[in-house]
């Protein structure tokens, strides 16, 4: 497989969007009471990131069966680079207090379609 930046250049050269975002998968460390206690601060932090355009999307994911909530989540950041995205993830109260651990990866968005902008926490819609 090619190096990441080489692949990104190849994608751009073939006309793909090649927009680099950062995907964080987050899992509880075991203390569910700490997760519940930290949730309000975590949600406030997410709203701040959304207002500052660093948060693209975030929310919980189910278990593999699709039937159970397992307190895992996915966060997509817009950041200058992996180090900047890691700063955002480290500052999340869930990670800062040790309620959750995370993995972060670069994501190259090449395809998809959006027709409008929605700020989920404030329920604002922009039909630009």
Can you annotate each of these PLM segments?
Residues 1-128:
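Conserved, structured core segments of small domains
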């Amino acid at each position: 497989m090619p190096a990441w930046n080489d692949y990104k250049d190849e994608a751009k050269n073939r006309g793909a969007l090649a927009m680099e975002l950062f995907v964080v998968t987050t899992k509880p460390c075991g203390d569910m009471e700490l997760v519940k206690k930290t949730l309000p601060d975590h949600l406030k932090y997410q709203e701040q990131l959304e207002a500052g355009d660093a948060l693209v999307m975030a929310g919980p994911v189910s278990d593999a069966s699709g039937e159970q909530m397992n307190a895992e989540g996915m966060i997509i950041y817009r950041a200058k680079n992996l180090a900047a995205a890691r700063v955002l993830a480290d500052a999340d109260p869930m990670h800062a207090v040790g309620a959750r651990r995370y993995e972060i990866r670069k994501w190259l968005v090449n395809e998809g379609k959006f027709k409008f902008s929605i700020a989920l926490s404030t329920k604002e819609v922009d039909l630009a």
